[in-house]
Amino acid sequence: YAGKYRRCVLGSTGGGRDAWKRPVMASLAEKYCDDIILTNEDPYDEDPEKIIQGMAIGVKHKTPLLILERRAAIRTALEHASIGDVVLITGKGTDPCICGPHGTKVLWDDASVVKEELEKVLGARR
């Protein structure tokens, strides 16, 4: 994607594990992305804000946006994208739910959310 503007929505590791990876992942995003949005993925019983802050410390030379609500983070990336931009969304893949505190699960599908939000963004631009 050389020559393309890259906007990255970066999920993290799930709550309660692999905290050491968080700043490393954000540092890699800083290296390869022009804009970075840090968001929620699967917090389980860990504070999602703490997870995102743990990622943010890995970004040294850019100012990432921190948006807890994953749909809002995706929408923001799409709203700021121009024709030809690359929007990379990481973290959930095909996972069917977001896992929250006390075993809660929210049904989730990144691909469907992107489609829904892109339709809204494109509709607003007409």
Predicted features along the sequence, with ranges:
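ATP-dependent carboxylate-amine ligase
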Residues: 1-126
